[in-house]
Amino acid sequence: MSNVKDFLKRKDIVITPQRYLIEALGAMAQGLFASLLIGTIIKTLGQQTGLDVLVDLGGYATAMSGPAMACAIGWALHCPPLVLFSLITVGYSANALGGAGGPLAVLIIAIVASELGKAVSKETRVDILVTPLVTIFSGVGLSMLIAAPIGAAASQVGTLIMWATEQAPLVMGILVSVIVGVALTLPISSAAICAALGLTGIAGGAAVAGCCAQMIGFAVRSYKENGVGGLVSQGLGTSMLQMGNIVKNPRIWIAPTLASAITGPLATCVFHFEMNGAAVSSGMGTCGLVGQIGVYTGWVSDIAAGTKAAITPVDWAAMVLLCFVLPAVLSVIFCEIERKLGWIKEGDLKLN
């Protein structure tokens, strides 16, 4: 037993929640931001300005999300070079086969492949062959075995969302907003789920509100700890960056989730806020302002179809309030209550 412990220590294989659920998960979120999310922002900018070069550039970046996440995980696990480079293939396969659960599949599979690769690294005279073979075979093999089931499990969130859309507007607003918002922050793809469900209309509006509550909520309430960089990366990128901190203290998730439970029914019952653009926009929130652009293109389409007379000041006010103002104000209020209760403290929202 002592020999095993000595071997694991020598290989820097540390099997702890801190290493896997905080360090690896936090790094994975940064990898996602540096590929899918920044690519989405660039692509959206290109689409709105008519610059095809930006659309292409953004497309290349988003296509590399799996490899980027896997390499980020490998970096967090202190993988040697050959293991780290081999994770590019592992990340691609896990993300491609994982569907809506792609990020979660990458997390699980890349961790296993990383540790197996580290275990054999520099143990043979043909390390240049053995290490990549073990890392890639184990990672791609696991991807073929479990990535699709992980994706199917993540897609079950869609079943819950569809049930929620059948409820009364008040209840539907709360449930859809909270569920899609939570899915956006988790290492699964809320955008893929919404796209698969064709989530538009009033339910799409509630989903947009829920996603914005998470992203803007985390961005604004953590401004003191993360500054402008954190404000932009979370507000225009993803609240998934906070997953490592959520694992350490789940109570930091309460404020934005409560905010989404308020903005959702306001969207459905008060403002009749609809998202009639591409369904994928319902699960994007303020990432690259894709959610808001989806709402706007929906307005334009409705006008062209004759179902909407014009875009009114009330429409713009609803978007600004539901997507930016209320998520910021409500999350800060709830955050201060949590601080007074001693549930969260300085540094709990700090991003590395």
Question: Predicted regions span which residues?
Answer:
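Pore-lining transmembrane helices
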Residues: 1-352
